[in-house]
């Protein structure tokens, strides 16, 4: 059964009037099939390679970073041009060491990265972005049931602007 697109697309790169989506290859393949069937507008393009997304003023990533297998700053460097603004939502964080655990998605388990908040924010600043706003999403905090001594993670959002 093909996955549903709307909750799975995690990174949207806008370029008016068209939109460009980046996601994992399996999700992108499903999205392309849905576009071919007319379920998704033809103006929306799907990429599994950041370098092929084109330039954008705004990068919106919601729930992407915990599944991204490279540092976010490397993802930004892979784009044709760094966007002026970045809006991140649902970024899994903790105050301790960064770690990777497994998340159950349907019958599968997938790697799930939880970043160290201080290090992540320092990387963003070092890569040339100013954090203009940040917010907590308390309902997405969770504790790894097999490792409760690690404490709960938190979910954050960020609005950033290139310096």
Give the positions of each predicted feature:
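Class I SAM-dependent methyltransferase SAM/SAH-binding core
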Residues: 1-51
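A conserved beta-strand element that flanks and buttresses the S-adenosyl-L-methionine
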Residues: 59-60
């Amino acid at each position: 059964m093909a996955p549903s697109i709307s909750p799975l697309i995690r990174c949207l790169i806008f370029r008016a009037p068209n939109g460009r989506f980046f996601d994992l290859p399996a999700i992108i393949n499903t999205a392309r099939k849905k576009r071919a069937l007319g379920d998704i507008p033809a103006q929306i393009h799907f990429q599994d390679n950041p370098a092929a997304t084109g330039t954008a003023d705004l990068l919106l990533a919601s729930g992407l970073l915990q599944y991204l297998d490279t540092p976010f700053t490397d993802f930004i460097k892979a784009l044709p041009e760094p966007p002026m603004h970045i809006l991140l939502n649902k970024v899994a964080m903790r105050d301790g060491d960064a770690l990777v655990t497994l998340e159950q998605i349907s019958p599968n388990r997938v790697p799930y990265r939880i970043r160290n908040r201080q290090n992540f924010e320092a990387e963003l600043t070092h890569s040339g972005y100013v954090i203009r706003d940040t917010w907590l999403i308390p309902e997405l905090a969770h504790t790894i049931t097999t490792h409760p001594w690690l404490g709960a993670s938190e979910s954050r959002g960020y609005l950033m602007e290139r310096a």
